[in-house]
Amino acid sequence: MNILVTGAKGMVGTALCNNLKNIRDGKNKTRPALNIEEIYEYDLDSTPAELDEYCQKADFVFNLAGVNRPENSEDFMKGNFGFASDLLNCLKKHNNKTTIMLSSSIQATLAGRFGNSEYGRSKKAGEELFFQYAQETGAKVAVYRFVNLMGHSRPKYNSAVSTFCWAVANDEPFTVNDRSTELELLYIDDLVEGMFDLLEGKEQHCEFDGVETVLKADGHYCCVPVTHKVTLGEIVDLLQEFKAQPTTLMMPKMPDGSFTKKLYSLYLTYLPTDKFKYALKMNVDNRGSFTELVHTADCGQVSINISKPGITKGQHWHNSKWELFIVVAGHGLIQERNINTGETVEFEVSGDKIEAVHMIPGWTHNIINLSETENLVTVMTCNEIFNPNHPDTFFEPV
């Protein structure tokens, strides 16, 4: 399959082309039905001759080209309707009736606040042109009316989310005019997966009730239904939480598919390189060190413990707190004793064979570095963040 992507250097085009190449090159094996040979990338610096060649050879067309912020309103029609005409005429010239996807906008509904949108009118005209082309040629046309897109793009241009991510990550000032303003957002990775579905003939269809998407199996339009409705206030509050994470160590709740998970990934792409690395607080004494790595709201914390040769650490028990000790370097011994029955167990552990050992509530425990020359390095997970006002930790030699 040869695929033509117009607007290949835009936010969507870049992400789509990168991921199409992953499939083509065998790096992404999640879509075994797709056999991609060539990816033709067309953008503003391409030539009419290249467009002509690509339209002749393409087995599928993603038309992402368009104008978002022209110098004058007339350029909306020229950029969004005019190029669409050129593209379709070129396909007609070569009698190429391959499937073609059109990237339109929710503004093309011309409903509600979009009633006077010049951008929406130009997108609507492009849609009508594509539907007419489908009737004339019998070619399959897939028109997507995208909501606000959320991906790495130029700040202070066409996306409030990108602007806020950039500003917070780079300590730049920003203004939120109304925290209650709600956005419906489509994340770039979800959009790309939707395009893969389209390539496989598994796209979802819809109609529109005003600006609301209504899934419908025989709908006139196509859609990627995985969107998120969030307020500007919620977005900036999350971003401030992300920014504080290297200091607080608190990792926000990020369930799979959640808006928070997607926003955090996007936020990180705006970090300046000098913020890629940050210091952690090492609690150091003559026995070694203990460093907390990550805190979570509902799964406790993860730490790294380093014990010097011959050192014993621990010698305490907990009522409800439990831990996992995972030695990743060195040679050690973990001992545990039930404080009520006196039963004892011990486990020899080594970085050469990584194993996890439970520290059970009600069992006092320790960890001993058996080496005379090497440090013992242990990853420790705990079901709660340490609270000095309620430590639940009681000294008791094993």
Where are these regions (language model features)?
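A short glycine-rich, His/Asp/Glu-containing loop-to-beta-strand
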Residues: 274-315
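N-terminal Rossmann NAD(P)H-binding glycine-rich loop of SDR-like oxidoreductase domains
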Residues: 1-26
